[in-house]
Curated annotation (Swiss-Prot):
Protein name in the entry: Elongation factor 4
HAMAP family assigned: LepA
Protein family according to the UniProt entry: Belongs to the TRAFAC class translation factor GTPase superfamily. Classic translation factor GTPase family. LepA subfamily.
Gene name of this polypeptide: lepA
Residue stretches making up the tr-type G domain: 15-197
Keyword Lyase appears in the UniProt entry: no
């Protein structure tokens, strides 16, 4: 039976504090392990417990993934009767949310590397582990799901040693579902993870790990105290801006919100200062006291830049103001979300947004639609290109419609990512074929005991759309992927403009690898022909590269039978009526506008189908 106590806060000895993250691949049981730690250490009663306690968003529970990092403080009394204060952060496992992992690790001295003992090491496990090692975080390997009949903990422990290169033969074996091995895990955390360094007598230095917006309280920030002590009612300063605020409330999550009157060196907690401007407390910034400020800011986590860009437009223009405010609130607790205003002739006013990947984009879109009731159109995602012009100037662009004339461009360079793919050997042939199809170049291939680690350099534009889905398909779901930007490489790209009755539709302009241009153009033109409603005149749809039409289709006009009342008689009367109709159609085509419903754009621009 675990010897746990219920939240005896105010531990003065920093040697009793352990700050750690839980990192793992998606579906390896980290959220369930968090639930078990909370339950067994008395964080919540049996009645208050629910599956995936820390996955607070409905989207997280529906998709079965962790999107936002969540923190909890619990207290534990070990076998010697000593009280330890455990602060742990549950982190996402999907490749798109690796920035959340780096933020969590910046606040910790240790990390539990949770690996499913039925599946083994995955590519994202590898990436997160190397991130932790680079940040000098102590790694504690944990083999989860030992209650399952197909568990092979010894094999997976050897895999961890072979692939990652850290000792794992004595790794903790546990089952987050049944609670088996959890007590041993807590003892290992206490023994192996170092206590936080810092001085309670030094000027306050607090790292902002995360922030979110509360409609009633304003900005709520999750912080880690690196040095000093923070009291309620203190006057604090945001070091990057120099602005001062008074502390209204401070506290911790247990995981219930619990108010305190102070946070001490080494602790992780939340702070409310009545900040209403959502960019006034940026994630990664340092807080200090205005009276006795620290000299230097804390070196925070690695800032992540957006990898893909897409235009987001409200379906109706009256939702624009609401959309702008919603993006501002979402960007507060998502450091990687970038946005700037954009205007499209076809879609109206919206925003050009930057994301870490397609899943990240889909999550943001789903949150905007669900939490703020905004109906959106999302354009086809693109990457950022480096362009060298004839005059020697270098520019970076992510919007195809803004690309200069191809005759003014000397070189176009596209971003290349290094993809690490872990897979059982039997799927190797199919995966190599897929990588070649995506213009990949093999860098390395290493055989381990039961898996193969493939490294390929692949254009990011090929990876972001549906590479992950295709990889899962050809490997029956067993392969895992992790990728990282490496460099820009010259490529022959072409800009494809879509014209409707000779008028360019900016929202449908795309960039394509020159060998794929014909097929992509034909797909879009054929799709538009099916979706655009017929008018009283012919509608021509053209795909154009440098004023040369490479694909074309025509939507035939609706035609009234003007001869329906002519029962015989002079043929000249029929010819006159037909000529009159023909002249009318010509005039209509000159002055008539093609009505393209926004639902057509919604269907054409669907990222998965495109």
């Amino acid at each position: 039976m675990l010897k746990c106590i219920k939240h005896e806060y105010g531990i003065k000895n920093m040697k009793s504090i352990r700050n750690f993250s839980i990192i793992a691949h998606i579906d390896h049981g980290k959220s369930t392990l968090s639930d078990r730690l909370i339950q067994l250490c008395g964080g919540l009663s049996e009645r208050e417990m629910s599956n995936q306690v820390l996955d607070s968003m409905d989207l997280e529970k529906e998709r079965g993934i962790t999107i936002k990092a969540q923190s909890v403080m619990i207290d534990y009394k070990n076998k010697s009767g000593n009280i330890f204060n455990l602060n742990f952060i549950d982190t996402p496992g999907h490749v798109d949310f690796s920035y959340e992992v780096s933020r969590s690790l910046a606040a910790c001295e240790g990390a539990l590397l949770v690996v499913d003992s039925t599946q083994g090491v995955e590519a994202q496990t590898l990436a997160n582990c190397y991130t932790a090692i680079d940040m000098n975080v102590e790694i504690v390997p944990v083999l989860n799901k030992i209650d399952l009949p197909n568990s092979n903990a010894d094999k997976v422990a050897k895999e961890i040693e072979d692939i990652i290169g850290i000792p794992a033969l004595d790794a903790i074996r546990c089952s987050a579902k049944t609670g088996e091995g959890i007590e041993d895990l807590i003892e290992r955390i206490i023994n192996d993870i170092p206590y936080p360094k810092g001085s309670i007598n030094s000027p306050l230095q607090a790292l902002i790990i995360d922030s979110w917006f509360d409609n009633y309280l304003g900005v709520v920030s999750l912080i880690r105290i690196k040095n000093g002590i923070l009291f309620e009612k203190d006057k604090i300063q945001v070091m990057s801006t120099g602005k001062n605020y008074y502390v209204d409330q401070i506290g911790v999550f247990t995981p219930k919100k619990l108010n305190k009157n102070q946070l001490r060196c080494g602790e992780v907690g939340w702070i409310i200062c009545g900040i209403k401007n959502i960019i006034a407390a940026p994630v990664g910034d340092t807080l200090t006291t205005a009276k006795n400020p620290a000299k230097n800011m804390i070196i925070g986590f690695k800032k992540i830049k957006p990898q893909i860009y897409a235009g987001l437009f409200p379906l109706t223009s009256d939702q624009y103001e609401m959309f702008r405010d919603a993006l501002g609130k979402l960007s507060l607790n998502d450091a990687s979300l970038f946005y700037e205003p954009e205007n499209s002739v076809a879609l109206g006013f919206g925003f050009r947004c930057g994301f870490l990947g397609v899943l990240h984009m889909e999550i943001i879109q789903a949150r905007l639609e669900r939490e703020y009731s905004i109906d959106l159109i999302t354009t086809i995602p693109t990457v950022i290109y480096e362009i060298e012009l004839i005059n020697g100037k270098i520019i970076y662009l992510d919007t195809p419609s803004n690309f200069p004339n191809m005759n003014d461009i000397k070189i176009i360079k596209e971003p290349i990512v290094e993809c690490s793919i872990l897979s059982p050997p039997q799927f190797l042939g199919s995966i190599i074929k897929l990588c070649i199809k995506k213009r990949g170049v093999q860098i390395n291939m290493v055989y381990h005991s039961h898996q193969v680690l493939l490294k390929y350099n692949i254009p990011m534009n090929e990876v972001i759309l549906n590479f992950f889905d295709e990889l899962k398909s050809v490997s029956s779901g067993y392969a895992s992927l992790e990728y990282d930007f490496k460099y820009f490489q010259s490529v022959k790209m072409v800009r494809i403009d879509i014209l409707i009755n000779s008028e360019k539709v900016d929202a449908l302009t795309i960039l394509s690898y020159h060998k794929n241009a014909q097929s992509r153009s034909r797909e879009i033109v054929d799709k538009m022909k099916k979706l655009i409603p017929r008018h009283q005149f012919d509608i021509s749809i053209q795909a154009v590269i440098n004023n040369s039409v490479i694909a074309r289709s025509t939507i035939k006009q609706l035609r009234k039978n003007v001869l329906s009342k002519c029962y015989g008689g002079d043929v000249s009367r029929k010819k006159k009526l037909l000529q009159k109709q023909k002249d009318g159609k010509k005039r209509m085509k000159k002055i008539g506008n093609v009505n393209v419903p926004k639902t057509v754009f919604l269907s054409i621009l669907n990222s998965r189908e495109s």
